[in-house]
């Protein structure tokens, strides 16, 4: 009886892991699709007068979708 309870708990834990992993994969796919749309519509908002090498290197409009600001020509 005790081994059946342990087996049932392990089976439930395994099923939960599978469900959580599947949800995370679906979320990653949705984030990639949304990120692609955001990258295409990324607009630079830093004026060229305030454009420095540090800002060009470190400023990002959408951090999660890897949409970098171009910061003009610097």
Curated annotation (Swiss-Prot):
Domain ShKT: 42-74
Name this protein carries in UniProt: Kappa-stichotoxin-Smt1a
Major subcellular location class: secreted
Site (described: Important residue for binding Kv1.3/KCNA3): 46, 48, 50, 59-60, 62, 66
A GO CC term attached to the entry: extracellular region
Disulfide bonds, paired cysteine numbers: 42-74, 51-67, 56-71
Site (Key residue for binding both Kv1.2/KCNA2 and Kv1.3/KCNA3 (occludes the channel pore like a cork in a bottle)): 61
Family to which this protein belongs: Belongs to the sea anemone type 1 potassium channel toxin family. Type 1a subfamily.
Subcellular location(s) per record: Secreted; Nematocyst
UniProt cross-references to PROSITE patterns, sorted A to Z: SHKT
Function: Inhibits voltage-gated potassium channels (Kv) with higher potency for Kv1.1/KCNA1 and Kv1.3/KCNA3.
Pro-sequence residue ranges: 23-39
Keywords: Cleavage on pair of basic residues, Disulfide bond, Ion channel impairing toxin, Nematocyst, Neurotoxin, Potassium channel impairing toxin, Secreted, Signal, Toxin, Voltage-gated potassium channel impairing toxin
InterPro entries: ShKT_dom (IPR003582)
GO molecular-function terms, A-Z: potassium channel regulator activity; toxin activity
